[in-house]
Amino acid sequence: MTMVYANIFLAFITSLMGLLMYRSHLMSSLLCLEGMMLSLFVMMTVTILNNHFTLANMAPIVLLVFAACEAALGLSLLVMVSNTYGTDYVQNLNLLQC
């Protein structure tokens, strides 16, 4: 594994650890998800360019489209939750609590 792949994989793992550890605010969770999507995009692009996969050239663009949709839905959820509860704590989203 080259250093480029190792650094991209480390960025993904760091974002995943941030998502698992700092999940008190919805905004920090969304930022960690965006970091994960960005590292997946870079990993996919570098892999396609290095291996000359001509049929998979559109895959990173499709991933970016899904990441943009995920970001838009996440931000709309953030606005709705902050308007309803006045804060963006993830504990407010737990529906199993009484």
UniProtKB/Swiss-Prot annotation:
Q: Which InterPro entries match?
A: NADH_UbQ_OxRdtase_chain4L/K, NUOK/Mnh_C1-like
Q: Which reaction does it catalyse?
A: a ubiquinone + NADH + 5 H(+)(in) = a ubiquinol + NAD(+) + 4 H(+)(out)
One Gene Ontology term of the biological-process aspect is: ATP synthesis coupled electron transport
**Which sequence ranges are marked TM in the entry?**
1-21, 29-49, 61-81
Q: How does this chain assemble?
A: Core subunit of respiratory chain NADH dehydrogenase (Complex I) which is composed of 45 different subunits.
Location(s) in or outside the cell: Mitochondrion inner membrane
Q: What class of enzyme is it?
A: translocase
Q: What gene is it encoded by? A: MT-ND4L
Q: Supply the Pfam families for this chain.
A: Oxidored_q2
Please provide one cellular component term from the Gene Ontology annotations of this protein: mitochondrial inner membrane
Membrane topology designation: Multi-pass membrane protein
- Family membership noted in the UniProt record: Belongs to the complex I subunit 4L family.
The protein, known as: NADH-ubiquinone oxidoreductase chain 4L
Q: What is its EC number?
A: 7.1.1.2
Q: Does the keyword Membrane apply?
A: yes
The UniProt record lists the keyword Magnesium: no
What species is given as this protein's source? Monachus monachus
State the function annotated in the UniProt record.
Answer: Core subunit of the mitochondrial membrane respiratory chain NADH dehydrogenase (Complex I) which catalyzes electron transfer from NADH through the respiratory chain, using ubiquinone as an electron acceptor. Part of the enzyme membrane arm which is embedded in the lipid bilayer and involved in proton translocation.
- Which key words are in the record? Electron transport, Membrane, Mitochondrion, Mitochondrion inner membrane, NAD, Respiratory chain, Translocase, Transmembrane, Transmembrane helix, Transport, Ubiquinone
Q: Which GO terms describe its molecular function?
A: NADH dehydrogenase (ubiquinone) activity
Superkingdom field? Eukaryota
